[in-house]
């Protein structure tokens, strides 16, 4: 467990994880990322974190134990995690999958890109926006900046 992780990547495909970690390392973000490999681990991890520490969740849809849609539904149903940004990162470009994720409260939906020229780099753009530019509500009791 990375106690300082701001980015939680929920992905079960080892190749996708390797590409993402390579891109994060290339941009000196590896210390800010934690990877979990199924939906139940994601829920356990998010609920164990102090509120506001995780700045974005990168969530795959098709995973063992608890799938991405159910993770999203549970995160949005819980007052503690309702405002944590969730970006669905999926190989599916089906309109039904995209619409379902937005209905469940996804903040964004990104289709995985497999081009070797920019493999993993699209995640850097996503993370830059959600971690460095976007602001989420502060947790109760935290000082406002």
What kind of feature is each model-predicted range?
Residues 3-4, 29-30, 52-56, 80-85:
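His-Asp phosphorelay/catalytic-motif detector in bacterial-type signaling
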